[in-house]
């Protein structure tokens, strides 16, 4: 949506594996700037014609396709494949082989904006990780809180679960209801949040994270609490 009418960008290639051949506006009606255009199949040769590419693929697929993309193409990966520094954490939370890590592209954090501008490959942060890291960063950076026990409860809208039809996301199930899920330290954004805050704090961070599915289409409300380091 941002790129569709952006004066600094010309969109020359839009691929969608499962929707290849379909009109873009039949899937995303708000993208009127692409009226009459269709989704293409994913092709590394077409990607290589681009100056900048955004990848929005399921876990593990960006790591596979990046091997076929030329080094001259700048890439922003919207998936999780290159977010984590720790191979152990990746294997634990994603149960897949580790592909390495790229610059973590959260521009509001210290020093990140200039680093992103100079990078050829960047990893876009996750949704929960963005909201929680930005909420906690000022207190963590200032040393005002005890980073060994940060507690987060965050509610997300239904679009965070993707477009695939699911019973638990139907109107009758979701309306007037709040549902916690992937709690107890198993949500895949947990290590991402901890790594991001550890970079700021310069010390170990531990996060207790409870995500909640809320009856709203989009958005995240994150409540972040911790004990202070300020003497009474």
What name fits each language-model region?
Residues 1-183:
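N-terminal Rossmann-like NAD(P) cofactor-binding subdomain of oxidoreductases
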Residues 160-232:
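Charged docking surfaces used in two-component/phosphorelay signaling
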């Amino acid at each position: 949506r941002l790129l569709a009418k952006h004066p600094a960008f010309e969109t020359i290639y839009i691929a969608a594996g499962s929707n290849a051949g379909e009109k873009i506006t039949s899937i995303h009606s708000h993208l009127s700037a692409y009226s009459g255009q269709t989704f293409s199949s994913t092709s590394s040769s077409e990607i290589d014609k681009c100056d900048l590419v955004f990848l929005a693929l399921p876990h593990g697929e960006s790591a596979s396709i990046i091997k076929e993309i030329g080094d001259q193409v700048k890439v922003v990966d919207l998936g999780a494949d290159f977010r984590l520094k720790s191979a152990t954490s990746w294997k634990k939370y994603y149960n897949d082989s580790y592909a390495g890590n790229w610059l973590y592209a959260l521009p509001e954090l210290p020093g990140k904006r200039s680093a992103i501008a100079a990078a050829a490959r960047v990893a876009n942060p996750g949704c929960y990780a963005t909201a929680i890291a930005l909420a906690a960063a000022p207190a963590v950076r200032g040393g005002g809180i005890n980073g060994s026990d940060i507690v987060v409860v965050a509610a997300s809208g239904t679009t965070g679960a993707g477009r695939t039809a699911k019973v638990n996301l139907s109107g009758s199930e979701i309306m007037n209801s709040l549902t916690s899920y992937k709690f107890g330290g198993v949500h895949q954004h947990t290590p991402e949040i901890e790594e991001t805050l550890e970079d700021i704090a310069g010390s170990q961070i531990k996060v207790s994270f409870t995500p909640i599915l809320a009856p709203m289409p989009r958005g995240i409300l994150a409540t972040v609490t911790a004990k202070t380091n300020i003497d009474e």
